[in-house]
């Protein structure tokens, strides 16, 4: 019986076993396991499967998947390392360079951000996210001249894009170039003119220029439109102190404390901040947000 099995069935069984253990089959198996792990958010498992797959076969696609898995797992240095290796083989890929810049931004490696943006700009000078992120990196490194220059470049690429214009105005405000802030604010698209960010900057600008009556009017409008913006209550209270309105100051401080309490109850730790950080995040991390959700790459 065993003779006939070996004669007629043994070869088939052997071929099946060899096929199962072949590098190609094992590679496919590991990729499948990695996909399942990613779909279940088991990112460490996915990383392990993809690393094993890369040991079997070097592949740009596999390395890209591994970089993404590291990103999901919030292991940014490893993600950046693999993106660098991919870039060695895809040196003409502007999107890849932008992605490297974005990952470096999360790592607070602003020099690497600037380097990647410079390479990306040589490949694509029409993508507004590149000079915008380059400007942010320059600013973080104390290079305000180039920061302003790259934001002006954003304005040239997309004249009606709000975030770079607002960021330029904000940078100039921090540089105390108040006249230029006024000029840039004139460039803000009309539909954004009453946004929280713009109104707040205008109010702070009036305050910095010692025009307290105008500042008060702007804070009144700001709080009328955004009554839960805690920081504005605090700042308006300070103006009322300067204007000798002690009762008004007490009322605003009370409202400020109520807003903070409400935000704490709602689990919002960003009570005293504008939402411009989130708008900026959506711009210069747009590529990353296609891969990982906000809570996965904090």
Predicted regions and their residues:
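Register position in tetratricopeptide repeats
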Residues: 39, 72-73, 106-107, 140-141, ...
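Canonical positions in the second alpha-helix
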Residues: 52-53, 85-86, 119-120, 153-154, ...
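Start-of-helix register in tetratricopeptide repeats
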Residues: 28, 61-62, 95, 129, ...
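Alpha-helical segment of the N-proximal tetratricopeptide repeat
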Residues: 20-61, 65-72, 102-106
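Short coil turns that delineate tetratricopeptide repeat
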Residues: 57-58, 91, 125, 159, ...
């Amino acid at each position: 019986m065993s003779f006939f099995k070996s004669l007629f069935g043994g070869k088939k069984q052997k071929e099946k076993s060899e096929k199962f253990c072949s590098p190609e089959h094992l590679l496919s198996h590991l990729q499948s396991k990695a996909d399942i792990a990613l779909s279940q958010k088991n990112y460490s498992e996915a990383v392990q499967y993809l690393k094993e797959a890369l040991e079997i076969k070097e592949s740009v696609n596999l390395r890209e998947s591994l970089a993404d898995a590291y990103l999901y797992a919030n292991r940014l240095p490893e993600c950046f390392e693999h993106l660098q290796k991919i870039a060695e083989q895809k040196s003409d890929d502007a999107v890849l360079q932008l992605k490297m810049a974005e990952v470096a931004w999360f790592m607070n490696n602003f020099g690497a951000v600037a380097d990647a943006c410079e390479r990306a700009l040589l490949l694509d000078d029409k993508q507004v996210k590149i000079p915008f992120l380059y400007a942010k990196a320059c600013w973080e490194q104390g290079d305000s001249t180039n920061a302003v220059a790259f934001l002006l470049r954003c304005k040239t690429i997309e004249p009606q894009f709000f975030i770079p214009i607002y960021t330029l105005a904000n940078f100039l405000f921090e540089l105390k170039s108040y006249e230029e802030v006024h000029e840039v604010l004139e460039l803000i698209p009309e539909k954004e003119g009453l946004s929280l960010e713009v109104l707040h900057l205008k109010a702070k600008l009036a305050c910095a220029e010692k025009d307290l009556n105008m500042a008060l009017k702007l804070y009144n409008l700001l709080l009328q439109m955004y009554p839960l913006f805690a920081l504005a209550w605090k700042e308006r209270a300070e103006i009322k102190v300067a204007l000798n309105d002690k009762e008004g100051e007490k009322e605003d401080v009370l409202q400020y404390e109520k807003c903070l309490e409400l935000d704490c109850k709602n689990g919002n730790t960003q009570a005293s901040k504008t939402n411009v950080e989130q708008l900026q995040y959506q711009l210069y991390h747009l590529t990353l947000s296609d891969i990982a959700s906000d809570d996965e790459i904090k």
